[in-house]
Amino acid sequence: MSSNARPTSVESPLAAQAPTKLVIASRESRLAMWQAEYVRAALQKYYPACDVSILGMTTRGDQILDRSLAKVGGKGLFVKELEVALAEGRADLAVHSLKDVPMELPPGFVLSAILEREDPRDAFVSNDYADLAALPAGAVVGTSSLRREASLRARFPHLVIQPLRGNLDTRLSKLDRGDYAAIILAAAGLKRLGLSERIRAVIAPETSLPAAGQGALGIESRVDRHDVQAWLAPLHHAPTALAVTAERAVSRQLGGSCQVPLAAFAQWTDAGALRLRAFVASPDGRRKLAAEAEATPATPAEAEALGARVAQQMLDGGAHDILATLGADAPPAT
């Protein structure tokens, strides 16, 4: 079984003995704690007699604020300490923003549930400008990801893109004190914290394709905790899970990490198909490549296959050459 797939052979939550006590591991940022509280409320809805508590933790990713994630180790910096708590039995489950979860989990861990997705798009935030098109030449835009940076450089070469680190409140304060003309954030985080009024415009996927898993919450547990997996089953949202499984399959096969300007976004169509789009670019935005495909996956394996198909299209189109220039662990050319 893939370390990124939800187990399929767990007890029915109706058959499993209801939990009496659960501990949720979470980062301590305001957004992370909101997400943990959201999961706690959902669990208490299904298990009202259960004592659900939150173990707040500071991760290495929270401590390193003077360098971009691409330079200090990437996504794993936000989950390692939480996984240690799971391994040691100090927590039963960990709540993550799925886009921050590495494409390959360490042995012994599994994504046991994926919740229904919030808005997956990027958000344009500015005190002075209505949208990206309104920014003048030389305007400084802050972003925390190479993916957004590459997308912006490809479509708005007249803008100056600068790194932006810190939690959500810190990033907004940097904008408010005038460090940036605008910043790009995930729309989901702003909406979850009741900050929708800060969004001047949501950015269409055609302009900035979202990251794999963006807007979705993933709940991680130990692979041997079948009881936890059963208790989490009512929280699992299958349509979201199939979409993000396809996205993560693309990213995993192309070596996706914070060091790679890679986007992957799957969206259900009105006809019931899953449309998967992917985009990779050099950091300066000059070399870029896109691919897409549709399928009607009913299982995680079929969603993985859709992701593999799009990843192969990318490789056939020259993604290997772009990835190689980044020093990424690019798959061999075929």
From Swiss-Prot:
Q: Which reaction does it catalyse?
A: 4 porphobilinogen + H2O = hydroxymethylbilane + 4 NH4(+)
Listed GO biological process terms: protoporphyrinogen IX biosynthetic process
Q: Is the keyword Glycoprotein in the record? A: no
GO CC annotations, alphabetized: cytoplasm
Q: Per the UniProt record, which EC number(s) apply here?
A: 2.5.1.61
Identify which top EC class this enzyme belongs to.
Answer: transferase
Q: Which InterPro entries match?
A: HemC (IPR000860), Porphobilin_deaminase_cofac_BS (IPR022419), Porphobilin_deaminase_N (IPR022417), Porphobilinogen_deaminase_C (IPR022418), Porphobilinogen_deaminase_C_sf (IPR036803)
Q: Quote the PROSITE patterns the UniProt record gives.
A: PORPHOBILINOGEN_DEAM (PS00533)
Write one Gene Ontology MF term: hydroxymethylbilane synthase activity
The metabolic or biological pathway listed in the UniProt record of this protein is: Porphyrin-containing compound metabolism; protoporphyrin-IX biosynthesis; coproporphyrinogen-III from 5-aminolevulinate: step 2/4
Q: Which cofactor does it need?
A: dipyrromethane
Q: How is the cofactor bound?
A: Binds 1 dipyrromethane group covalently.
Q: Which residues carry this modification: S-(dipyrrolylmethanemethyl)cysteine?
A: C258
Query: Which UniProt keywords are listed?
Result: Porphyrin biosynthesis, Transferase
Q: Quote the record's miscellaneous comment.
A: The porphobilinogen subunits are added to the dipyrromethane group.
* UniProt similarity note: Belongs to the HMBS family.
Q: What is this protein called?
A: Porphobilinogen deaminase
The record lists the organism as Ralstonia nicotianae (strain ATCC BAA-1114 / GMI1000)
